[in-house]
Amino acid sequence: MIIKTEADIKTTIPADDSIKGVQKQVLIGTEDGSDQIIMRRFIVEGGGHTPAHSHDFEHVVKVESGNGVVIDNEGHEHPVSAGNSLFIPPNEKHQFKNPHSQPFHFVCIILNPENSG
């Protein structure tokens, strides 16, 4: 069993021109012995966004704090806030944005892309 505290978690800033104001934390991952799933936290600063993207695996998201917007396959914006849970099917294009001034935090659980095939 692995139990981690906030002090154990490293924060990285993804280096990609399609990302703005986003911090990423791997809460549980392969370094912890989890070969099949990865749990990550994203912190999106006010005015920030993740890239619009899709992938060939499903994943679930839990909004921890703040308010944001999820943009779907068709470009529709869906407001989300603390307590909301999302299911994103495989190959569905999506993007998270924070049009507000306060940070927007969410946890994302995915299949390990290296072992999901």
Label each residue range with its predicted role.
Residues 1-36:
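A short, N-terminal "cap"/entry segment at the start of jelly-roll beta-barrel domains
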Residues 40-55, 90:
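Conserved short histidine dyad/triad with adjacent acidic residue
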Residues 43-45, 55-70:
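Short, conserved beta-strand element in jelly-roll/cupin
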Residues 50-52, 70-71, 88, 94-100:
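Short beta-strand His + acidic residue motifs that chelate non-heme Fe in jelly-roll/DSBH
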Residues 74-90:
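Short acidic-glycine-tyrosine-enriched beta hairpin
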Residues 82, 90-115:
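Ligand-binding loop in jelly-roll beta-barrel domains
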